[in-house]
Amino acid sequence: MKKILLVMALALGWQQAAMAGFTEGATAYNNKNYAVALKEIRPLAQAGNADAEHLMGLMYYMGRGVPQDYKTALEWHRKAALKGKADAQYVVGAMYYTGNAVIQDHKQAVSWFRKAAEQGHPDAQQVLGLMYRYHIGGMPQDNVIAYMLWNLAAANGSMNAAEQRAAVVKTMTQEQIEEGQALSAGWKLNTPLPQKSRTGGG
């Protein structure tokens, strides 16, 4: 029992130290002190901390404190994305969408955007809505799902989503609008998003 408690205490101590190190690194990054950020963040990323992996990805993507390297950026973002980091999932989706450092693959982009969107990531919700609206990446054209996603993203502060919603609503029937409202009102965070609506297409 004492050994178990000791292991738990050591793990908790490491987590607290890691959090302190990440906070220092993130603060340095935001203050444009990239050398300090790299010193604090790299060991945490190498130890598998998802937040640090994501920040390392950003540093390589932007060329801040390290040479700009999109492939390395993708590797770090993917590590964090596989651990469930929504911001990283969004970036991986965007890189697949544009073909940046990877072969362009809209279906892969959809998969990553959906993972982030289901965690409430407003940019992922907004982009996924566009993919439904304009039938991208093998998505069915579905204005109701697009409206639902933009409703969610707008509620999370996305002005782009609010503008897209205002545009698409002009093309929708009252029945479609009501379904979109009901879908967004009934959806729960961290649950699967619907892939098609009842009243549907464009």
Task: Please name every model-derived segment.
Residues 1-4:
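Positively charged n-region of N-terminal signal peptides that target proteins for export
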Residues 14-20:
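Sec/Tat signal peptide C-region and signal peptidase I cleavage site
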Residues 7-13:
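Bacterial N-terminal signal peptides
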Residues 21-28, 43-44, 55-62, 91-98, ...:
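Hydrophobic face of amphipathic alpha-helices that form TPR/SEL1-like repeat modules
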Residues 158-202:
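Terminal, low-structured helical/coil segments at or just beyond the last alpha-helical repeat
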Residues 29-33, 46-53, 62-64, 69, ...:
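Short helix-capping/linker turns of helical repeat alpha-solenoids
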